[in-house]
Amino acid sequence: DSARVFKTTDRGETWSAAVTPIPSDSMGGITSIGFIDHVRGLAVGGNVGRPHEHQENVAYTDDGGATWTQAGEPTYAGAIYGITVVPGTGIPVFVAVGPGGVDFTADLGITWSSLDTRNYWSVGFASRSAGWAVGPEGRITKISF
């Protein structure tokens, strides 16, 4: 099965579903979505039960989530737990985290580069110079672009 993204434009009165190329099963699916504007975004996820396998776990939309296309894979194997957009970079930069590390893309998910190879659970940015990734055992890592 393929993971789906649900969208509403009327505050939850009605919903539409869009199929993504990200596989979905009891151990996997979409974990996070990030948008740079109202039409362009990335959905990420994967199967947490396959931590050592590269997975088709990134999808791109350029029509507000109506359709999704397979994007490139991050440098690390396993699922992606979170994704966010770095504000104020000029060109869109997404940062993704998972048990394989922290990666970023500056071309809407086509190619990825590694920032760290340690396990992380979540990531967020207040500005291009104030981002944090968090992981097990109290790990907090500051990230700047």
Regions found by a protein language model. Name each.
Residues 1-145:
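Residue-level hotspots at or immediately adjacent to binding/recognition sites across diverse folds
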